[in-house]
């Protein structure tokens, strides 16, 4: 009689499922706990702000008048359009300045990469209060030293309350670190040397190559840089208030004393718009990645 070996006897048997280790369960529980705490940390203040804006103090019910009254609020249209114009101009100037710089450094002048990175990081090292004090001192030269000269007229033109170009120039400097990092990440992820060489071999000029080849390859990076710049400009308060210009953030602070619920409603709405822009950029990025993989 033939006896089966242990290996042969268990060949057709199904192995029992491996037990879940307690360490993995604990790690999963800790993850959920941390995410729950972070969610409460962000959602509780937002929920309290929303409740503060929709609560009717007089009758004790709920109302949406503070949200519906935003477009007709005194000074809202002027401050919002001014900040939006400043944001658009800042984005255009920053991209016109940094896109050719990043492409040139990565394609032709790689030795200058460290120098350019250090220069673009300077606004993060320099406090905004120190920057605005320096700008204010320079602007004071116009009436003190250059009165009745073309330079003084140029200084005065930069400080027009309707569209303060001096804020655009300062915001471009503040946005350089974010714009450079976003564009540099996109350039490193794209095969720009091959793309530009192919375009040049087909007879395209450098401006045509930059517009038709480089910018489409860096579309997501350009969107990220633009969004970061818009968020910076729409939320900047210190420089605008010290230089004496009314922008969207300074308007919110100004009305917070007389209309606190309206100011909080505007802040909540701005936060929601920011989230929507983030979701749109993420959706475009995922859509582009899906097209590239397919």
Model-assigned labels for residue ranges:
Residues 1-35, 109-113, 281-294:
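Transmembrane alpha-helical segments of polytopic membrane transport and secretion proteins
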Residues 21-28, 67-76, 234, 240-292:
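Interhelical loop and adjacent transmembrane-helix boundary motif
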Residues 29, 37-74, 294:
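Short membrane-interfacial helix/loop motifs at transmembrane-helix boundaries
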Residues 64, 132-172, 240, 244:
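Membrane-interfacial helix termini and adjacent extracytoplasmic/periplasmic loops
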Residues 89-121, 133, 186, 214, ...:
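Transmembrane-helix boundary motif in ABC transporter permease subunits
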Residues 108, 188-193, 197-218:
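Short helix-to-coil transition segments within interhelical loops
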Residues 156-200:
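Membrane-cytosol interface at the C-terminal ends of specific transmembrane alpha-helices
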């Amino acid at each position: 009689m033939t006896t089966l070996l242990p290996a042969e006897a268990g060949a057709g048997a199904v192995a029992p499922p491996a037990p879940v280790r307690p360490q993995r369960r604990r790690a999963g529980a800790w993850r959920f706990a941390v995410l729950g705490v972070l969610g409460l940390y962000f959602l509780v203040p937002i929920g309290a702000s929303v409740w503060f804006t929709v609560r009717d103090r007089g009758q004790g019910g709920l109302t949406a008048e503070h949200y519906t009254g935003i477009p007709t609020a005194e000074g809202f249209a002027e401050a919002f359009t001014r900040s939006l114009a400043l944001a658009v101009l800042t984005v255009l100037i920053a991209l016109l300045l940094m896109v050719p710089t990043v492409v040139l450094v990565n394609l032709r002048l790689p030795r200058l990469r460290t120098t350019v990175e250090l220069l673009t990081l300077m606004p993060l090292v320099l406090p905004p209060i120190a920057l605005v004090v320096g700008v204010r001192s320079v602007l004071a030269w116009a009436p003190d030293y250059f009165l009745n000269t073309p330079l003084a007229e140029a200084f005065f033109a930069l400080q027009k309350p309707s569209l303060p170009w001096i804020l655009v120039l300062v915001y471009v400097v503040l946005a350089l670190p974010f714009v450079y990092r976003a564009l540099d990440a996109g350039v490193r992820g794209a095969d720009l040397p091959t793309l530009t060489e192919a375009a040049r071999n087909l007879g395209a000029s450098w401006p045509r190559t930059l517009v038709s080849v480089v910018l489409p390859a860096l579309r997501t990076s350009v969107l990220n840089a633009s969004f970061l710049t818009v968020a910076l400009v729409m939320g900047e308060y210190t420089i605008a208030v010290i230089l004496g210009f009314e922008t969207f953030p300074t308007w919110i602070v100004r009305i917070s004393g007389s209309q606190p619920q309206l100011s909080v409603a505007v802040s909540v709405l701005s936060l929601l718009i920011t989230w929507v822009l983030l979701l749109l950029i993420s959706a475009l990025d995922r859509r582009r990645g899906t097209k590239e993989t397919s």
